[in-house]
């Protein structure tokens, strides 16, 4: 069994999605997930993961931060994004006034990058796991697939069929 935790780059279960191509999966990725939400989803499922199971983490952007589930956000109005967390750029583009002022007051790149790194460090310790990202990242322990996304943008996990197939091939290489 392959367990998947991550953001929208892993959330689709369509036939052409890399998450379907790679085999028998339990997919707990969700659109707009912060790294904290990815950690929490993993911790909830950890008791169900068997010793020989594979765990895939699709790490998100350092600038996506957790938002409690009972808070309103325009992105959460979409049925596909009910647990969407805040990403700095979206808040400003969508004019989320209730968050703009707070973020302008508290935002500190160093702090949010440090918290992100602490969570990633914890997840890197998960046995039998592989780590991917589609965002630019200085982390060398994480397989960076940003170039695949940029060259193959589309509707399934933000990629076209070719992009999803390429990601599946890379994951299959990691597993063997």
For each feature predicted by the language model, list its residue ranges.
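Alpha-helical cap/lid subdomain in secreted, periplasmic
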Residues: 44-176
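Serine-esterase "nucleophile elbow" of acetyl-processing enzymes
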Residues: 1-41, 47-48, 160
